[in-house]
Every structure is written in structure tokens, then in C-alpha cells.
């Protein structure tokens, strides 16, 4: 029989926000680890920025948000902050949006590399963000106080090239679906349908 074990996993997060006129800035730094795993004198701390973004409001409902940010949509099955996990989840992306009383539309664009390559193409080595490129369009409409619907299309580009030769071969996987919420009186009824097509990084 396996022996029982015990440990304490800890996340310490410090968040700062700044707003002025049409500009908003968000910074969030965190340290994640198990108690006792770091030496008392540590020259290589694991303190990272999990959020660092700037948002500019253009007026009339239009805005742009650039930088490291959480992407949280609907019930978070497809895109969420994953804050139940000790580390959480973040994306380096540009978000363009329009919002009014009954409508929200967001376009999210991302391009990832894990090295400052100046030659040799755009091969994206594994081990960092799971995707190389991302384009996501999300739209939500509030029909009335009891019913709203959202639609999402996501195109993920994942590196499927030769790791030894570092030849890039991007494979594209698409996700398309809707999230419906109906709230009559004290009840909430929800439905979610999604379909995936395209190719994974293995083909």
C-alpha cells in the first residue's frame, strides 16, 4: 500500500490597477510553489508577471487591450482564467472589442515564439504556450433580461514541424460553438454546443 503524504501549495499574488481618462493599466505578479522547495537564500526566484496589460477606450463602445491578460468567456470551458489551478492561466495577446448595452464583440489575436529568432524561420519549440498563433472571435447578445446567447470561433495554429531540423509546419485547429443561457424566474437553464475541425499538431 502507498503511504500517505502531505504538502502545502501556495500562491501569493499582488495586483495593481491604474485608470485615467480612457486609459487603464493592469499589473499582477505572483509566486507559486510548495512550501520548502525554495532555499532560504535564493538568487533565482520564481516571481513572474501573470498580467501586464494596457487598455485604451476609443469611445462609442470601442476599445483595445494589449499585453499579458486573462481571457474569460462564458462558462470558461473553452477560455477561462483557470484560477482553481494554483498558477492560473494567461495569454499574450491583442484584444479588440466593441460593447454596448445588449451586445459584446471581441476579436483576439496572438502570435507566440519562445526565442528571439532573427533567422531560420518561425519554428515554435514545445514547452511554452500550447499554441503558436490564435485568432478568436466572440460575440454575445442579450435578447432580454432572461435570455442571452454567445457565439465563439477560435482558430489555433500549433507547431507540427520537425524539432531536430526546426522546420516550421503550422497545423490549424478550429473550434466553433455557442453558449445559451435562459433564466426564467428563479431557474437557470444553460446549453453549450461546440464542434472542432481541422488538424492537431500531430496531423
Place the predicted regions along the sequence by residue:
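Short acidic (Asp/Glu) patches
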Residues: 48-49, 78-80, 90
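Signature for the C-terminal beta-barrel architecture of outer-membrane proteins
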Residues: 60-64, 82-203
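Beta-barrel outer-membrane channel/assembly domains of diderm bacteria
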Residues: 1-71, 94-105, 141, 178-196
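"Short basic amphipathic alpha-helical interaction patches in structured regions
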Residues: 41-42, 78-84
Amino acid at each position: 500500500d502507498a503511504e500517505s503524504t502531505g504538502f502545502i501549495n501556495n500562491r501569493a499574488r499582488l495586483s495593481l490597477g491604474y485608470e485615467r481618462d480612457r486609459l487603464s493599466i493592469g499589473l499582477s505578479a505572483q509566486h507559486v510553489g510548495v512550501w520548502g522547495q525554495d532555499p532560504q537564500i535564493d538568487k533565482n526566484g520564481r516571481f513572474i508577471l501573470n498580467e501586464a496589460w494596457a487598455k485604451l477606450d476609443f469611445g462609442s463602445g470601442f476599445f483595445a487591450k494589449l499585453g499579458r491578460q486573462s481571457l474569460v468567456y462564458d462558462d470558461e470551458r473553452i477560455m477561462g482564467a483557470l484560477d482553481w489551478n494554483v498558477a492560473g492561466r494567461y495569454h499574450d495577446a491583442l484584444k479588440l472589442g466593441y460593447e454596448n448595452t445588449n451586445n459584446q464583440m471581441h476579436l483576439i489575436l496572438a502570435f507566440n515564439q519562445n526565442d528571439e529568432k532573427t533567422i531560420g524561420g518561425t519554428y515554435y519549440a514545445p514547452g511554452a504556450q500550447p499554441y503558436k498563433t490564435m485568432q478568436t472571435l466572440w460575440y454575445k447578445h442579450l435578447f432580454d433580461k432572461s435570455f442571452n446567447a454567445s457565439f465563439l470561433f477560435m482558430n489555433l495554429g500549433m507547431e507540427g514541424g520537425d524539432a531536430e531540423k526546426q522546420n516550421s509546419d503550422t497545423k490549424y485547429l478550429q473550434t466553433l460553438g455557442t453558449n445559451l443561457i435562459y433564466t426564467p424566474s428563479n431557474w437557470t437553464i444553460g446549453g453549450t454546443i461546440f464542434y472542432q475541425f481541422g488538424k492537431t499538431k500531430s496531423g
